[in-house]
From Swiss-Prot:
This is Dehydrodolichyl diphosphate synthase CPT3. The keyword Zinc-finger does not apply. Its main location: cytoplasm. It comes from Solanum lycopersicum. Belongs to the UPP synthase family.
């Protein structure tokens, strides 16, 4: 009997919490709402030590925080959510820690793609961004399955950056742009003797047309599926970007709450949205000038 009553109370509290949240989001929606929020999920290990948890449980608590934040962003009307899950630099950690994180990552990826998962209930499409070749086969295949399984979802987009750094992304985009331009130029050499390439070199207009520009690099970025972020939230109080979205973050708001990632909550999101709305005109003007 107590168990049944406990469930009823829990369900009632959840309904009240959801109602209050919807009221708050309705008020916030009167002002501008960001289309893209990115998160640097910092502090899982420190949270584990702080709470005297077993290895890996800090990251499990962090996953729960991600699910809650994903739900809040969706309810607020944020179309794009990006999370920095695993840097290329993280491969330099102790081998046993990397193996443990890879196992946990695979477990949580599979959990996200279940029929009853939050991403399917809310219609969220998942992209994994980064140098996926660096991942173990099991994790890479799980990521690929998740992208295929959620490809029909269109209400919001969750980009999960794994085996990612911004410098690697930029190098990748420049390489792809060079190869694309070279293929275009080679197609002009119909005689395969270089004569058309010489004429191209002499024609200033054509030469400029085949130069690599910012738009070419933008198109080949891992993050090309999303607009530039409006807000980057890094937990644990650190203000550095740690090689995350350096190309895309020149005109976004950076928020660094002292809370560790598993401790992040609704109040932090509300605060940063209010800060974004206060600075909206300034940020908009800066984007126009760029």
């Amino acid at each position: 009997m107590e168990g049944v009553n406990g469930k009823k109370v829990g369900h009632l509290c959840e309904n009240i919490s959801s109602f209050v949240r919807q009221c708050i989001f309705s008020i916030l929606s009167v002002g501008p709402v960001p289309s893209h929020i990115a998160f640097i999920m910092d502090g899982n290990r420190r949270y584990s030590k702080k709470q005297n948890l077993l290895d890996g449980n800090g990251h499990r608590a962090g996953f729960s925080a991600l699910i809650n934040m994903l739900k809040y962003c969706y309810e607020l009307g944020v179309k794009y959510i990006t999370v920095y899950a695993f840097s290329i630099d993280n491969f330099k950690r102790r081998p046993e820690e990397v193996v443990s994180l890879m196992k946990l990552m695979q477990e949580k990826i599979d959990e996200l793609t279940k029929e009853e998962s939050i991403v399917n209930r809310l219609g969220i499409r998942i992209y994994f961004q980064g140098n996926l070749k660096l991942l173990s086969d099991h994790v890479r295949l799980a990521a690929e399955r998740a992208m295929v399984k959620t490809s029909g979802n269109s209400k919001a987009i969750l980009s999960i950056c794994v085996a990612y750094t911004s410098t690697d992304e930029i190098v990748h985009a420049v390489q792809e742009s060079c190869e694309e331009k070279w293929d275009e130029i080679r197609k002009l050499d119909v005689n395969n003797d270089g004569s058309n390439l010489i004429r191209l070199e002499e024609n200033v207009k054509d030469k400029n047309e085949h130069r690599i520009g910012v738009t070419n690099v933008d198109r080949h970025m891992y993050m090309s599926v999303c607009p530039d972020p409006d807000i980057i939230i890094r937990t644990s109080g650190a203000t550095r970007l740690s090689n995350f979205l350096l190309w895309q973050s020149s005109h976004c708001l950076l928020y660094s709450p002292a809370a560790l990632w598993p401790e992040i909550g609704l109040r932090h999101l509300i605060w940063v949205i209010l800060d974004f709305q206060r600075n909206y005109l300034y940020l908009k003007e800066k984007k126009k000038q760029s």
